[in-house]
């Protein structure tokens, strides 16, 4: 069957496909898994395939391009105006098929495997930084409860925490000193992990022109 345009609504395990002919009439509706979808599109004659840019869309977009299809990704907010009131996965797929044909539609470039790798590295690094910040804030909060105020900023905690642990004149219990020492180790390990990730990110970016 030859189609003018296909819209695909992506799910985690199930995909809904709607194909339109040259008059804009929906002539095919199909619900399938990723494997079934790629098997179906392998021999499909279609001028254009549209999808919303979301998790998994870049992988599927590359797979469809390898089959020889023209594939375009769109931000979800630009597809929303074409969605009908009665929401369903097939109606969403049809809205995608309608939206992808619009001359003023904004498209998202399909990321390469290397670009997705770099994106994943940055996301993990961001989570590690947030965890380290949480440790810093907890250290400052625990010390404040014992009358010790540290200036804001990780560098101040890095510099002053060893001195606090070594200062025998501070009225800190043995239990609390052990806890502080454990938090100090956690903070140092977090920083080392982030610095190592920075090196991996830089190496990945240098080795790939698309990144």
Spell out what each predicted region is:
Residues 1-211:
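A detector of single, family-specific signature residues
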């Amino acid at each position: 069957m030859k189609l003018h345009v296909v819209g695909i609504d992506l799910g985690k395990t199930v995909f809904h496909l709607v194909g339109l002919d040259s008059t804009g009439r929906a002539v095919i509706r199909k619900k399938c898994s990723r494997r079934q979808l790629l098997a179906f599109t392998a021999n499909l004659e279609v001028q254009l395939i549209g999808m919303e840019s979301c998790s998994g869309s870049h992988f599927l977009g590359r797979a469809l391009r390898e089959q020889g299809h023209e594939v375009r990704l769109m931000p979800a907010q630009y597809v929303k105006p074409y969605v009908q009131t009665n929401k369903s996965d097939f109606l969403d797929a049809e809205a995608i098929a309608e939206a992808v044909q619009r001359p003023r539609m904004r498209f998202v470039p399909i990321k390469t495997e290397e670009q997705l790798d770099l994106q994943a590295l940055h996301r993990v690094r961001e989570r590690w930084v947030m965890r380290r910040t949480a440790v810093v804030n907890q250290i400052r909060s625990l010390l404040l409860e014992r009358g010790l105020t540290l200036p804001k900023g990780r560098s101040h905690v890095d510099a002053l925490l060893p001195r606090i642990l070594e200062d025998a004149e501070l009225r800190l219990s043995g239990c609390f000193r052990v806890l502080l020492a454990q938090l100090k180790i956690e903070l140092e390990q977090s920083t080392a992990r982030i610095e190592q990730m920075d090196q991996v990110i830089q190496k990945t970016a240098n080795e790939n022109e698309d990144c």
